[in-house]
C-alpha cells in the first residue's frame, strides 16, 4: 500500500474488505435449505476484522491524504459505524448492499434470479435507515449502479418513454442525501440494460447459475431465468461505454470483448453533449449544487410519506435552512397534497427535471423530481 501511495494514488476501493478475517476454527455452515453454497456468516465480519483495518489505517492510511471506501456485503448500519466512525480511525465509508437486495427473495434457492417486484417503500426504508443511523457517526457511500449492478432505470424505473426523466429522478434522490455519491460510467447519460440471448452473456455468474438452476436442478424455467438476467445481470453494466453513434460506439476500432447495447446510436455521450437538457448536464448541475450548498453535506435527514408507493420525499435541515427533495418514481401523475404542509410561502427551486416547476402544489408528472429550499 505504501508503494502505491508514494506513486501518487489518491485512495483505495477495497474489494470485500469485510472478509479479511475468518473464524480460525473454520466451522461448517449448517445445511438447512438444500443449497450447496452459503455466504456470509463465517467468512464476513470476522473476529479480527476491525483490528486489521485499524492497523492498516495506523501504518499507512493515516500518513497520507487519501480516501478509502470498503465493500462490505452483509453489513448493517450498526456495522457500518464500526468501519466509518472517524473516532475509530478505520475507513471513510463503505458500500452497503442492503438497498440492492430489496427486489430479492430472502433464502430463495434461485438466489437473485427469482425476481421480487420493486416496492418503493422498501427502498425508502433501507436508504433512510442508513441516512439516520450514520448521521454524525459515519459516512454513506451513495450509489444505485456499479460494475456488479444493472442500470437503475431499467431495474426499477422506465427506460423507454421516460428514460431521461427517470434517470434524472433517481439522480436527484441520490444526490440530495448525505454521503458521497458514486456515478458509474454510462449512468450520467442514462444508459440502459440490454436484452441479449442467454448464450451471449459473458458473466460467469450467469453461466454458472444457468447450469445450476435451469439445467441441473430445474428450480427455475429458462424463460423466467432469461427475464431475471435481463433485469439483474452484471453484464447490463459491463457493455462498452457508448461514446458516439459510430461503429462500436466509438469505444474501439478493434473487436470489443462484449456485444454493444442495441441502443448505442440513440444513447451516447456525443448526443448528450449536444442536448442542453440532457441527463449529462443534469448530473453536472447536481454535482455543482453539492459543492456549493453546505446543507447537502451537513444537514440532517427526515423521510416524508414513508408508506407512499410512488413518491420518495425527504427533508434536509441545518441550523440555517431547510430543503425538501421530492421525486415521483412512477409513470403516473400524482398529487403533492401530502407534502404541502411542509412548505412555507418562501419557495426556491434549486434544481428540477421539469423546468416549469415553481412550487409544491402542482401535481407531480411521471418521474418528476426537484429540490426546493423551503426556509
Annotate each language-model stretch with its function.
Residues 1-375:
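Active-site and adjacent substrate-binding regions of carbohydrate-active enzymes
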Amino acid at each position: 500500500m505504501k508503494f502505491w501511495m508514494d506513486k501518487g494514488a489518491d485512495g483505495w476501493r477495497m474489494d470485500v474488505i469485510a472478509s479479511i478475517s475468518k473464524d480460525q476454527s473454520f466451522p461448517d455452515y449448517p445445511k438447512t435449505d438444500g443449497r450447496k453454497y452459503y455466504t456470509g456468516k463465517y467468512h464476513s465480519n470476522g473476529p479480527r476484522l476491525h483490528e486489521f483495518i485499524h492497523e492498516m489505517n495506523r501504518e499507512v492510511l493515516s500518513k497520507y491524504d487519501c480516501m478509502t471506501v470498503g465493500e462490505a456485503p452483509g453489513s448493517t448500519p450498526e456495522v457500518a459505524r464500526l468501519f466509518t466512525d472517524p473516532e475509530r480511525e478505520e475507513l471513510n465509508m463503505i458500500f452497503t448492499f442492503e438497498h440492492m437486495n430489496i427486489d430479492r427473495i430472502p433464502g430463495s434457492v434461485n438466489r437473485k434470479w427469482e425476481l421480487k417486484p420493486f416496492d418503493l417503500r422498501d427502498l425508502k426504508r433501507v436508504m433512510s435507515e442508513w441516512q439516520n443511523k450514520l448521521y454524525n457517526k459515519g459516512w454513506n457511500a451513495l450509489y444505485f449502479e456499479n460494475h456488479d449492478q444493472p442500470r437503475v432505470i431499467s431495474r426499477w424505473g422506465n427506460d423507454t418513454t421516460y428514460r431521461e426523466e427517470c434517470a434524472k429522478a433517481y439522480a436527484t434522490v441520490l444526490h440530495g442525501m448525505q454521503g458521497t455519491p458514486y456515478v458509474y460510467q454510462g449512468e450520467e447519460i442514462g444508459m440502459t440494460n440490454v436484452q441479449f440471448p442467454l448464450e451471449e452473456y459473458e458473466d460467469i455468474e450467469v453461466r454458472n447459475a444457468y447450469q445450476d438452476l435451469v439445467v441441473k436442478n430445474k428450480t427455475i424455467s429458462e424463460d423466467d431465468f432469461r427475464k431475471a438476467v435481463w433485469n439483474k445481470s452484471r453484464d447490463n453494466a459491463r457493455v462498452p461505454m457508448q461514446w458516439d453513434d459510430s461503429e462500436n460506439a466509438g469505444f474501439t476500432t478493434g473487436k470489443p470483448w462484449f456485444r454493444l447495447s442495441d441502443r448505442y446510436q440513440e444513447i451516447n455521450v456525443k448526443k448528450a453533449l449536444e442536448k442542453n437538457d440532457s441527463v449529462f448536464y443534469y448530473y453536472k448541475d447536481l454535482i455543482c449544487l453539492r459543492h456549493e450548498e453546505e446543507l447537502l453535506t451537513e444537514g440532517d435527514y427526515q423521510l416524508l410519506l414513508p408508506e407512499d408507493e410512488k413518491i420518495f420525499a425527504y427533508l434536509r435541515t441545518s441550523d440555517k435552512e431547510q430543503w425538501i427533495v421530492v421525486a415521483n418514481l412512477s409513470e403516473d401523475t400524482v398529487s403533492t397534497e401530502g407534502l404541502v404542509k411542509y412548505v412555507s410561502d418562501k419557495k426556491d427551486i434549486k434544481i428540477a427535471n421539469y423546468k416549469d416547476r415553481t412550487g409544491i402544489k402542482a401535481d407531480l408528472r411521471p418521474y418528476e423530481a426537484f429540490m426546493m429550499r423551503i426556509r
